[in-house]
Regions:
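Terminal amphipathic helices with adjacent charged low-complexity linkers/tails
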Residues: 75-116, 150, 337-341, 358, ...
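Internal maturation/activation junctions in enzymes
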Residues: 208, 215, 524-546, 550, ...
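Catalytic alpha/beta core of large soluble enzyme barrels
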Residues: 121-151, 437-438, 531, 535-536, ...
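Function-dense linear segments that define catalytic or interfacial modules
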Residues: 158, 171-191, 195-221, 225-268, ...
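A glycine-rich phosphate-binding loop feature that marks nucleotide/adenosyl-phosphate handling sites
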Residues: 42-43, 61-64, 77-85, 197, ...
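Core nucleic-acid recognition elements
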Residues: 11, 34-174, 189-196
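Alpha-helix capping and helix-loop boundary segments enriched in small/acidic/polar residues
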Residues: 11-15, 164-167, 189, 208-216, ...
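Polar, glycine-rich mid-to-C-terminal structural blocks
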Residues: 316-317, 325, 329-397, 401-404, ...
Length: 794
């Protein structure tokens, strides 16, 4: 009896077994350890009259996915190809493509995308689309493993209003390249250049750029960093700012250190202030209420310095016990730690807590200046203070870190001491993922007196104003009952002067593909050019954010795939060979990144605040690294391929296009997309499961073989002191920071070990550590938890 199947478009046709055989043959062709017959037999497809063609495709994909295992990892590519065949078909139906052709002409893709309201109408302006269409290489789709193509489909491919995909991977990459190259003089060749590095997975842009470049909503930045002043206007203006940034998908880092503490003075009334926690509770609710386009709740890290009198409550924010009104479970607390605090911990001496209302300048200083002011305030009997053993507070911090994974730790003095733009500002906090370190400044508020005759006068809050009757008042005490120079005051308001909110524009080099001197020299200039273009093409939710980004022209080029690269080269994690290899790679990336930005400065101009920067003085990131870091790498004094003195002179002469250059983000999503290991981290396990809308997907580390097996050491089996040392070697070469996670097995955990890890991080010049991930040695849960990760930096 003839069996009829129902196609996706509703049409019925006779079942043709040869089509299924042809598809399974194509899916398995050239892949070791898999076979066409095994796929077809194990699928157990029961052919029933009237069945849907989609059911056949789904059965084959499901079979291939379930067969992914340590000894047969190539089934992931079989599943990816089967998924791609289905995707080609679905996009063809949605866009009315030509039957039998996976990729329609670039012109047709763009026309359909614009008509659907998904592509920006100017995307093709000035391009030869026939030439670019011929340049697209559909065979690069075969680079995807199954989880990679599923991630691309779920998170990045443009869909129509019915949630049907209307673009294919190479169309997406070309459209992104065209968008980023649109202002280049030779945009045609630059679009090809950009397309090559991203479609070959040599460099990958961060999630917001991948998602939004080419669309009408081209918000391309990953994270934002801001600060709130200690007044009600500034705090609530900050809420509005956070809401708008979260609305457009940005992760947020926010400094709260200027907010007066619980029991502080308000308007000369003692014990009137509610402290930071009530305001952080509102921030917590804001993160939930203003989600990221309905996909996930907002993500906000909140920063405080350990001398703030609210520090104990702050450390307890995510604690599962205690008064719920004092908890903020959806925020990510982080500490902004001075060298002085760490020294007091090491000395086992006392630590003093202050109300920032009484010690305003502690937030504005670092290093020796901070230390001198702090000690002076300790000795000032007129200032309200509290004391506790520094080691007791440190123990509380580490206990919370171990129990709930936070607060993250960031080192204030190291961040500011190495700040290339310390001449024009101060670093007050990091971002959500603790890899971005840039100047920020809270909004400033002046007193505006509007008189009944319509005239206006403005004053600083502390300015003295003589009102009629001869009484002298501070400007912030003048009211509508007063007159000045015979003019009756109509209303007193505060006028906002925008501060600086920093922006992170990110991309990552895939070390599993780019790890030689020649390849680094080839791809880094392209990556820097793309990121620099992001600054000018970005949609900014707020004027002040755009102004800050144009002033510093900040970017963050990082890396991913370090663990895969080490396994390829058969280098053990934490070995001297690992340290030497990563030192060589990071030096090459640092040198070429700085050179590329300087080359761009010659072509397009320097960033506005270049003069006076460390760059302008020829000071490079590695010049500021602790001497102890150099001792970690076994190399001769003159063992370098690069002439840094020549580069110093070039930078002093030609300038820099970008004020901040390098930062290593977590890269969770984009490393999955390109099929490599996450950022700089050792692997979680050799095999684990990723949770997806489709269920649990087995994942095997890339290129696993008998030769690489021993070099994929699971993260929880590695001495975490070696993780810190590797991070210190990378940090030597980068001007910003890196997201460094620590992995702690419960059978190895102790207060002493945690203390050793984090004090070593401080001593070796790390600017931050991110999550502390703990695991029971007998844990059977092989599912990777990504619920706490920032979407933007990935």
């Amino acid at each position: 009896m003839a069996i009829m199947i129902q196609k996706r478009n509703g049409r019925k046709e006779l079942l043709d077994i040869t089509k299924i055989q042809k598809m399974s043959m194509e899916a398995t062709k050239g892949l070791e350890g898999v076979s066409q017959s095994e796929l077809e037999l194990d699928a157990h497809i029961k052919f029933i009259d009237g069945m849907h063609s989609k059911d056949i495709q789904d059965a084959l994909i499901k079979t291939a996915v379930e067969k992914i295992d340590i000894d047969v990892p190539n089934w992931t590519f079989v599943a990816a190809r089967l998924f791609l065949f289905d995707l080609y078909h679905r996009v063809g139906i949605a866009t009315h493509g030509v039957k039998g052709e996976a990729y329609c002409h670039l012109k047709d893709y763009i026309k359909f995308g614009i008509e659907a309201g998904r592509l920006i109408p100017s995307i093709a302006d000035g391009y030869d689309l026939d030439e670019l269409n011929a340049y697209i290489d559909p065979s690069r789709d075969l680079l995807f493993n199954y989880l990679g193509i599923k991630t691309l489909y779920d998170r990045y491919l443009i869909k129509n209003r019915k949630a049907e995909p209307i673009e294919l991977p190479q169309q997406m990459f070309m459209a992104i390249a065209m968008f980023l190259a649109q202002n280049e003089k030779d945009k045609q060749s630059k679009a090809k250049e950009f397309y090559d590095v991203i479609s070959k997975f040599e460099v990958m842009l961060a999630t917001p750029t991948l998602s939004n470049a080419r669309t009408n909503r081209h918000q391309l930045s990953s994270c934002y960093i801001g600060s709130s002043p200690d007044n009600i206007e500034g705090i609530f203006d900050g809420y509005k700012e956070m809401a708008l940034l979260s609305k457009y998908g940005g992760g947020i880092g926010w400094d709260w250190n200027q907010i007066r503490s619980l029991g502080g003075v308000i308007d000369d009334h003692k014990s009137a202030a509610g402290g930071t926690v009530p305001f952080l509770k509102i921030t917590n609710d804001l993160a939930i209420a203003v989600d990221q386009l309905g996909t996930r709740k907002g993500a906000i890290a909140v920063y405080l310095e350990p001398w703030h009198m609210d520090i104990v409550d702050f450390v307890d924010l995510k604690k599962n016990s205690g008064e719920e009104r004092r908890r903020a479970h959806d925020l990510f607390p982080a500490l902004w730690i001075s060298d002085l605090f760490m020294e007091r911990v090491m000395e086992d001496s006392y630590w003093t807590l202050f109300d920032p209302y009484e010690v305003r300048d502690l937030s504005e200083t670092f290093g020796d200046e901070f230390k001198a002011k702090y000690i002076a305030y300790e000795n000032d009997e007129s200032i309200t203070k509290d004391r506790m053993k520094a080691k007791d507070l440190w123990k509380k911090i580490l206990t919370s870190y171990f129990e709930v994974g936070s607060p993250f730790l960031c080192w204030k003095d190291t961040a500011n001491r190495t700040n290339p733009n310390s001449h024009v500002g101060h670093i007050r906090s990091s971002n959500l993922c603790t890899e971005i370190f840039q100047n920020t400044n809270p909004n400033h508020y002046k007193i505006k007196l509007e008189f009944e005759d319509g005239t206006v006068s403005t004053y600083e809050e502390s300015d003295l104003v003589v009102v009629d009757g001869g009484v002298t008042k501070k400007a912030n005490k003048v009211s509508a009952l007063d007159s000045v120079n015979g003019k009756r005051v109509f209303i007193v308001e505060k006028e906002k002067i925008d501060g600086d909110t920093a922006v992170c524009n990110l991309a990552s080099i895939n070390l599993s593909k780019i790890n030689t001197k020649e390849d680094i020299e080839r791809v880094v200039p392209t990556a820097i050019r793309m990121l620099d273009n992001v600054i000018d093409l970005n949609f900014y939710p707020l004027r002040k954010v755009k102004a800050t980004n144009l002033k510093s022209r900040s970017i963050g080029l990082g890396v991913m795939g370090e663990a895969e690269m080490l396994a390829q080269h058969q280098l053990a994690w934490g070995s001297s060979e690992h340290f030497k290899k990563i030192d060589q790679i990071m030096e090459a990336i640092s040198y070429n990144t700085i050179k590329s930005s300087s080359d761009l400065a010659s072509e397009k101009g320097v960033y506005p605040t270049f003069e006076g920067s460390k760059w302008s003085k020829g000071i490079m990131p590695h010049d500021l690294a602790p001497q102890a870091v150099n001792a970690l790498v076994d190399k001769d004094l003159f063992d370098t391929s690069y002439d840094w003195d020549v580069l110093r002179e070039k930078v002093k002469k030609d300038g820099m296009r970008n004020g901040y250059l390098m930062a290593i983000a977590p890269t969770s999503s984009i490393s999955i997309l390109v099929g490599t290991t996450q950022a700089i981290e050792p692997v979680y396990k050799r095999k684990w499961f990723e949770e997806n809308l489709s269920g649990l997907i087995p994942v095997v580390v890339p290129r696993l073989s008998p030769e690489t097996w021993a070099y994929y050491t699971p993260a929880f089996e590695i001495d975490q002191l070696q993780v810190i040392k590797a991070a210190a070697i990378r940090q030597k070469w980068i001007d910003q920071g890196q997201s460094t996670n620590i992995f702690m097995s419960l059978d190895k955990a102790s207060g002493k070990y945690l203390h050793e890890i984090y004090t070593l991080a401080w001593k070796l010049g790390l600017k931050s550590t991110y999550y502390l991930r703990s695991q029971s040695p007998e844990a059977k849960n092989d599912v990777e938890d990504r619920s706490m990760e920032c979407a933007g930096c990935q």
